[in-house]
């Protein structure tokens, strides 16, 4: 299984290749629009993917997967088809890009990579950027097909917990333990019974890249994960869970992602919630 990551050096060497599409997937929890940063500095040839606008507009939950038709139309307008080699990055390093990597893979893209270290590493190395509004991109056809094995809904989540599945929560420890309030109003504090906690920052190295090899494996094992068993990732709203999914993919370990995450589970009255470690 090939790595889900691409280095800044490798991407720089491939700029301008036919069939290479670069996506700025920057999104911020505080609601800031990522587009101004995209227009201030972006990797040459990049297009901007609006995570909020590309989620399911009919769901009351944040960031839910859209239908294949909606996603395919959105990607087509960005000039991306499912056969392209797609590189996704964000302006933080590794934060929202893995969510869009996961969306693309789950909805039919065949070759998607996350830029390791993102735009901060690219800029720190003095690599070329573009500014201003991007040039219009020719429309493409993206044939989106949902991989149902990649995503978990609440019914499947209940069944998985009842069967003792490994559930790995990417939220900060204080939120997981119920010691800190959730950033979204109306959600209970705590976690699903039996869930494990691996805050997403624990799989990111000091330089903003994803940990690799033994260091990455140790992060999962230290959280209690058995890497010989399947894993379901979750978080607050399905964004940072994808960072754990990315880490598992780097270890050639498949995973599924609970799309509703805590925004769904913690907002219902008929779901079990526990506090503490």
What name fits each language-model region?
Residues 1-277:
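Cytosolic catalytic domains that perform sulfur/thiol-centered chemistry
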């Amino acid at each position: 299984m090939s790595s889900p990551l691409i280095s800044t050096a490798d991407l720089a060497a491939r700029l301008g290749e036919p069939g290479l599409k670069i996506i700025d997937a920057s999104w911020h929890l505080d609601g800031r629009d990522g587009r101004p940063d995209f227009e201030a500095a972006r990797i040459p040839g990049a297009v901007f993917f609006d995570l909020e606008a590309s989620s399911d507009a009919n769901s009351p939950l944040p960031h839910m997967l859209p239908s294949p038709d909606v996603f395919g139309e959105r990607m087509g307008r960005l000039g991306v088809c499912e056969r392209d080699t797609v590189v996704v990055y964000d302006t933080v390093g590794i934060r929202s890009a893995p969510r869009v990597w996961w969306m693309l893979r789950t909805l039919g893209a065949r070759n998607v990579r996350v830029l390791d270290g993102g735009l901060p590493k690219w800029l720190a190395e003095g690599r070329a950027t573009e500014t201003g509004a991007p040039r219009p991109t020719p429309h493409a056809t993206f044939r989106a097909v949902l991989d149902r094995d990649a995503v978990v809904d609440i019914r499947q989540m209940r069944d998985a917990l009842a069967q003792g599945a490994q559930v790995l929560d990417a939220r900060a420890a204080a939120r997981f333990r119920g010691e800190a309030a959730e950033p979204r109003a109306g959600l209970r504090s705590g976690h699903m019974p039996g869930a494990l906690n691996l805050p997403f920052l624990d799989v990111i190295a000091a330089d903003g890249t994803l940990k690799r090899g033994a260091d990455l494996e140790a992060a999962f094992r230290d959280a209690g994960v058995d890497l010989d068993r399947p894993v379901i990732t979750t978080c607050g709203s399905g964004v940072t869970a994808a960072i754990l999914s990315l880490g598992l993919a780097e270890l050639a370990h498949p995973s599924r992602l609970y799309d509703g995450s805590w925004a769904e589970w913690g907002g219902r009255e008929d779901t079990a919630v526990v506090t503490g470690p």
